[in-house]
Amino acid sequence: MNIDLKRTPLMVLGTSSGAGKTLIATAICRCLKRKGEQPIPFKGQNMSNNAWVDTKGREMAYSQALQSWSAGLEPSAEMNPVLLKPKGDCTSEVIHLGKSVGTSRAINYYEDWFDSGWEAIKKGLAILLKSKTDGRLILEGAGSPVEVNLQHKDLTNLKLAKYLNANCILVADIERGGVFAQIIGTIALMKPDEKKLIKGIIINRFRGDKALFETGVTWIEKETGIPVLGILPWLKEIFPPEDSLDLLERKQINQGAEIEIAIIKLPRISNFSDLDPFFSDSSIQMRWIEPGQELGEPDVLIIPGSKQTIKDLESLNKTGLSNQIKNYAKKGGNIFGICGGLQMLGKSLEDPHQQESINETSTSSNMGMNLLPIKTTFREIKHTSQREEKVSWPFSQNIKGFEMHYGESDLINNKDSEIISLFKNSSLGWVIEKKDKSFVGGTYLHGIFENDEWRRQWINKIRQKKGLNHLKIDEENNSDKRERLLDLLTDAFEKNINIDILIK
């Protein structure tokens, strides 16, 4: 071990991507907090376009922000020192300690970024442990820890476990099938000094009577010499998954609800967690629309953020979905864009530094839908910050969120008297409300729908146009709901899993 620790770290490894590492690490954070400890969540390297911005304006994966809330801490970029944000075409933006440091193609990543990534990880650890001297690190691995072709350059699994001499938990997803092969195969591919770090096994997503798996537990423990810490059942209430595919496959929620929200499933969608507050609202049905599908007549259309706005807009143009959106607006449809979605609604998108285009020379893709009189220019420096601003529509109130974008948008002209600034700070968003009470607008403020009162008034605007009664503000706000779900998750974890032998 190369670093002084008062408490042995716990590390959650998985037999594969999607095994359940994120939620289990999240539950362990709350579990230890209940025991009077101070857990410190940490994921050395994460790949995700679902990001959060901390109070210092630095980017980190949303899953580590969730884990920090579970631990009772304020999110900080040191908890996720290396973040890779896929841009498509085997290319990712590289974020070190919250700041963008470059772009890398997958084939060159380890050669170009391994050493600096490892230094960022060690620096993040040092800063966290200096401020939380009595805390216990709760580490989350990434994917499988035994990808033999990549293992020598793996920043965030067994290299980190050995560096910290962590007690490791191996999570296997029984829902996928082949759970015995998952466990035995993963351990067999480890070196002797790596195997000895595995102190427990968790069987995740089990359906049915656990008594039916007792012989399986006995066999696993006999073959591996490692105790099975418990069997976690399939949980009905879950959080935003790390892999966007899991969420996007929820094509219809609350079928038959009074209001239908359609969401464009952009090929390079980012920050889909902006939409989470709607998924637990029983008055709303959510429907995903892929390029090439029919838009239909939803009550409102949301165009979410994109990691590559110009390419995603080009996809909408090629498949005819842009024309469908324009026709929907002409017929009185309600449209709202977030970040990249706002940019697409404008007249033009200029990329002089090729932040979005990546060697694209085409200019046709730079024409927006022209539903808002704004022009977007992508700058060399990304703007990231938390914000609290006064919103002016559909009513006046202070709301919170965060910015995370290269593009800057400005009004081309203000001759259209219908357009208004959403905020006192006009560069954060605009809206046009037409005589028939339909609207087209958008904002750069991620997390805007987390503001419960504003979200309800926004929905009531749509309900009013449809002739429905206004709904009251939810008694349970989004933050309280998240806390309740964290407690429910931890209750289920504590009922089924025993980690006491790992923390003594």
From Swiss-Prot:
It holds the Pfam family GATase_3. InterPro entries: Class_I_gatase-like, CobQ/CobB/MinD/ParA_Nub-bd_dom, CobQ_GATase1, CobQ_synth, GATase_3, P-loop_NTPase. Residues 258-454 form the GATase cobBQ-type domain. One of its GO terms (biological process) is cobalamin biosynthetic process. It comes from the Bacteria. Keywords: Cobalamin biosynthesis, Glutamine amidotransferase. The active site is at C339, H446. Catalyzes amidations at positions B, D, E, and G on adenosylcobyrinic A,C-diamide. NH(2) groups are provided by glutamine, and one molecule of ATP is hydrogenolyzed for each amidation. HAMAP family: CobQ (MF_00028). This is Cobyric acid synthase.
